[in-house]
Amino acid sequence: MRLVQLSRHSIAFPSPEGALREPNGLLALGGDLSPARLLMAYQRGIFPWFSPGDPILWWSPDPRAVLWPESLHISRSMKRFHKRSPYRVTMNYAFGQVIEGCASDREEGTWITRGVVEAYHRLHELGHAHSIEVWREDELVGGMYGVAQGTLFCGESMFSRMENASKTALLVFCDEFIRHGGKLIDCQVLNDHTASLGACEIPRRDYLNYLNQMRLGRLPNNFWVPRCLFSPQE
């Protein structure tokens, strides 16, 4: 196994099965963040992740972290909070603000550079990247964004500036996603936070099989239309 250098003149990727074991899932470097290349990557179960100043690195880890939406873990305290939630939740109202929030609300630094923000904003304008926003009155207090692949949603990042804001985004999105035929959320790599929400690890080959099936599925044509998903009780 060896790390592949991508060409700027081709959007082709090597097979994910050729990814390194250490660091887990590192497959290739280089290329660019053009919409065509990003979409090709997601269609093959590959995603970019790299530090500022480093070359673009492309990953497909084994195992893969996923969340079955119906398995979302909601604690008793979160259920009580959501029942009296002060938040309003929308979809695709403020993609730019959400990705900027994800980029800026990281004490330990972020991989979401200016180039990444611009790249995913282009994907959003093309109808492939989407955001969930959480508002306290007119203030954006949390949210999440990711890339749609049919009935599979590739979650990229989330942020929270008030109590339970990002959890509210995920809870409301999962409910809406399930109701309209959504099947699976890709979490990429398991961490303590995603594990606490019900995410689990599956073999990469299983994830790729699910991806190949689900990316051909269809949600309702109006699913990603900007709209309000949840309003606080009066």
Swiss-Prot record:
One MF term in the entry's GO annotations: leucyl-tRNA--protein transferase activity
Domain of life where this protein originates: Bacteria
Coiled coil: none
Protein location: Cytoplasm
Keyword Acyltransferase recorded: yes
One GO biological process term: protein catabolic process
Reactions mediated catalytically: N-terminal L-lysyl-[protein] + L-leucyl-tRNA(Leu) = N-terminal L-leucyl-L-lysyl-[protein] + tRNA(Leu) + H(+); N-terminal L-arginyl-[protein] + L-leucyl-tRNA(Leu) = N-terminal L-leucyl-L-arginyl-[protein] + tRNA(Leu) + H(+); L-phenylalanyl-tRNA(Phe) + an N-terminal L-alpha-aminoacyl-[protein] = an N-terminal L-phenylalanyl-L-alpha-aminoacyl-[protein] + tRNA(Phe)
E.C. number(s) listed in UniProt: 2.3.2.6
Listed PANTHER family: LEUCYL/PHENYLALANYL-TRNA--PROTEIN TRANSFERASE, LEUCYL_PHENYLALANYL-TRNA--PROTEIN TRANSFERASE
HAMAP family the UniProt entry points to: Leu_Phe_trans
The name this protein goes by in its record: Leucyl/phenylalanyl-tRNA--protein transferase
Species in which this protein is naturally found: Escherichia coli O1:K1 / APEC
